[in-house]
Amino acid sequence: MKNPKFNEKFNKIFNLELYQNNPSDYVHSHVDQIISLLLYAWAIANKPQSPKDTQIVALLLFISSESKGLLEQIRTGEGKTLILGLTAAFFALCGYAVDVVSSNRDLAIDGEQKCRTFFELLKLESGHICSENDDINHQSYRPDLSTKQGNIVYGEVGAFQRDILEDEFNNKKIFGIRYKDREKCLIIDEVDNMCLDRARHVLYLSHEIASLKWLETLFINLWAAVLRTEVNNSNEISQNIEDISYFMKKNIENKNIYVSEYLYDYVDYKLKRWIDSAFQGRIMREDDHFVLDIPKADGQNIQKHRTIIVVDKDTGTEQYSTRWSNGLAQFLELKYRRKLSVESLKAVFISNKTFFQRYKTHLYGLTGTLGSENSQSFLADLYNVQFADLPTSRKKSYYRFPSKASFEHEDWLDSIARESIQQVKIRPVLIICENVESTENIWNELIRHGVPPHTIAKYRRDGNNIEERFRKKSCYKR
């Protein structure tokens, strides 16, 4: 986007020798001038939207937090995308390599695209690492070395972790010299979910060993044994695991189940874990813990065959690069008659905690809920951060209806449908479901009550571009 007046103002600042010699010192010593420039740029790039007072305060708090990181609580609807964009731009102008982590791939792509024009006005390079093409993703890490400004990369936490492992352990030189002579800074969306709820989550780079293919016969026999077992309560499962383990070992010793001798120790070590996974797979349901469908990227199918796609129960997003370990993936493939994959071995790994701690005092985050005092104390000790609770930009005008409870599933669905039909006469209705299964059940119940299908926008999977649909037609006339 070209804006002669803005470009003149921008060039007057950033062509200065003081900025070229030390961008960070110059920006921090001229904060009022830089913030004025950022707000002006955002207003040009996003007419008629301008930052609100609370959003400016959020930016100022991030800037003033020098010796520690900062996690801010800001309510839903207060414009986190704008705050993330302003903060990323400020630290990129300081010369930092800025990484922005979202809770899923779709939000990362959307966040970068919404801020791209704003970044371009400030002559900042931005990109995301959410493409199916690794070469395109890796290009996002390569800044223009002729400028002192840093560049900005959006992505989900797993994508950054994978690239770190590939770069540092497999020597793929993904980052080039991006982090070599620059400070690095991490800005996190939904920080409580990733830093607290998922602090123990670990990303592995796995390796498939061809010889483990010979375990297929064992997996089939394990699955058959688990299906034959009667389980009346969860307390019985431990004893069932012991019994099946003993039975399988005897069959392996007697050559009734073939296992190569060089795999004996490995099988002995993993057998009980596999049996436990088989019991888990037996009770796991499609459209709850996972979906059975064709993976999508940017709304396009990336495979021809339906496969098991892990669903994150916290966010409802599909985890295309995630596979369950300890045989669980294989037992679900047997359950749903998919092609049986080979059990993989974990080679190198990194936890969420370790990843976030790499950024030291340059760790910044936003969330709708910071949690209890105990949670905040835990985060402060773990990541060396402090906290801020920001007020809303205006007084909220809403009230809560009395809660209703149903004892039967059919009554629960009926109540939701009747209440929705009543409320939609005067306002739009949003129904947030626990899983895909509930989405389908409520959809069918609304249809049963006579709601026309074309008046219901159903968001069932990643890649369903519901936001674009509502931009074109925000509500339905009744």
Label each region the model flagged:
Residues 1-478:
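Conserved P-loop NTPase motor core
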